[in-house]
Every structure is written in C-alpha cells, then in structure tokens.
Amino acid sequence: MKKYLMVIASYPDWRQEFFKTHMSSRNKEYCQIHGFEYIEITEKLEPVRGKIGWIKPFKVQQLLKTTLKDGDILTCLDADMAIVKKDIQYIPSSAKSFAYSIDSGNTHCMGSYSIRVNDWSRKLFDLIVDEDRYKNLHNQLTIHERFGTYSSFWEGFYDQASWYSLAGIKRHSDKPFWEYSDYGWHSDKTLTGEVNEWCKYSLEELYEHVEILPTAWNVTELEGESSCEFLINKTPKEDVFIRHFAGGQQWRKEWFEK
C-alpha cells in the first residue's frame, strides 16, 4: 500500500508565494512524518468545464484510473489549507472508502478528503465528474434556505455540489448537519417527501463506505479570524487539525508556527 497527498496550487498573485513558503513546506513535512508521497501541482492549468474548481476531481479520477492501485490511499487538500496538528494522519478508517469533514460552515466540504482506492471509490469519482449528471444538473436552480434565493449550486461548488446530489444532501442548513439523522444524507427531499431523484447512494451504502470526520479537520470559520457569517459548527482554537482559509479570508502565517 502506498499513501499519497495531492495539492493543486496555481495562483496568479501573492497567494502562490505564500503557499510555497508556508503550505508547501508544511505539507512536505507532514508527508515525511506519515510516509506519504507528495504530489504538488503548481504549473498553470487550463480550466475544466470553464472552471478552475473542476480540475481537482478530474485529476483524482485520472490518478484512480492510471496510477493508483487497490488499497492505496489518496488524500487531497485545497491549497488554502494549513495542516496544524502534524501528528494526525488523514486517512479513512480501515473499513471505509471515502472520508471527509462537515466543516465550520456546515457544508459536506470537498476541500479535503481521503480515498481508499477500490472499485467503489473509483466509481464514486466517475460519478462525481460524470458528464450526463453535469449536463442535467449544473444549470438547475435550487434554493439557498438562508437567503431564500434561487441559483445554480453547481456553478459555484463543482464537485461538492456533485457529491451533494449523489448523497441526497440539501444545499444548505443553518441547523448543524451533526444534528440531523444520517448527517444530512438523504435530506434533499421533494414536496412528497421522497429523496431527490438524482441521489445515487442508499443510506446503507453510504454508511458502509463513507466516514464523516470532525469539524476540527476542516475549520473554515473562526471567531476573530473570519466573518463568521456561517459559523455553525464551532471548534475551539486549540482543537484545530486543519485551518481552511476559505471564502477569501486572510491567510494567517501564525498557524504554521504551531
């Protein structure tokens, strides 16, 4: 079994140098501690489907098809993430195929995740980037319950919106998904109470293959550091494993001094 950590960082501004100085160095140190091979992609990349955000899931699918073997681990982090606690290993539990966190903003966040390579996880990423699903869903208007407005979820959230459709997760909830039955899986209901027709996975299959990790693994909002407009799942500062500078917030080098 081999373990890989993949990060894609291709910024046109100061963030690229910040990434190189802080994130890249920490990622390499983390890989050395836990025996990961580090895959860092920093060259200028062409958008996929007209969006930078689709590059990562298509790259994952490519690795699953061409490079990775059954039993291997592929962990992916967004480039705006800081690994804080170096002693925690980011891999799924032995019986699971896919692991990710419900973040501070109460999203089933695809900014970071870990894959145990097998037939199920290969099929998962085939579905995440599936062209027919994309054509049918990327222009579909859905309601954001906080704002009461309709827009395309897929146009701004790419693979995350795709995962929501596969697991039947409602687009937004101000009630923590931790308080839902089944983590919010199958919460996207029709008016008749049925789960959305685009949901692919049964609850039984989700529980068999997917592991939901604590919010400390993807801290996107923190008092004193971000707007906290979507601070729904709070994490004490001392418990943060991964600090995610999402949504245009300030990148803070002090997180790399820990």
List the model feature ranges, each with a label.
Residues 1, 68, 92-94, 104-108, ...:
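Extracellular/periplasmic catalytic domains that process cell-envelope and extracellular macromolecules
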Residues 8-10, 100, 244:
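Short beta-strand/turn micro-motifs composed of small residues
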Residues 1-71:
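N-terminal anchoring/stem segment of glycosyltransferases
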Residues 38-41, 74, 98, 209-212, ...:
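Conserved beta-strand scaffold positions in the cores of enzyme catalytic domains, especially
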